[in-house]
Amino acid sequence: MDPNCSCATGDSCACASTCKCKECKCTSCKKSCCSCCPVGCAKCAQGCICKGASDKCSCCA
């Protein structure tokens, strides 16, 4: 169980404007959680809730 999430890691969970679940998918907003979302990252900006800003983003490399 993720201490920051009400679901087991990998399971579905509800989210608001932020995602603290490491590997959870958000069901309430139908978006995935991005671990890093630097400003100007089009791939991260679409269809995901950002957990935090970072210059190192695997989905924007």
Curated annotation (Swiss-Prot):
- Which residues are recorded as binding a divalent metal cation 3? C15, C19, C24, C29
Q: Where are the N-acetylmethionine residues found in this chain? A: M1
Q: Which Gene3D superfamilies match?
A: Metallothionein Isoform II (4.10.10.10)
| A single BP term in Gene Ontology | cellular response to copper ion
Arranged from A to Z, the UniProt key words for this protein are:
Acetylation, Metal-binding, Metal-thiolate cluster, Phosphoprotein
User: Where are residues bearing Phosphoserine located in the sequence?
Assistant: S58
Its recorded name reads Metallothionein-I, hippocampal
The species this protein belongs to is Bos taurus
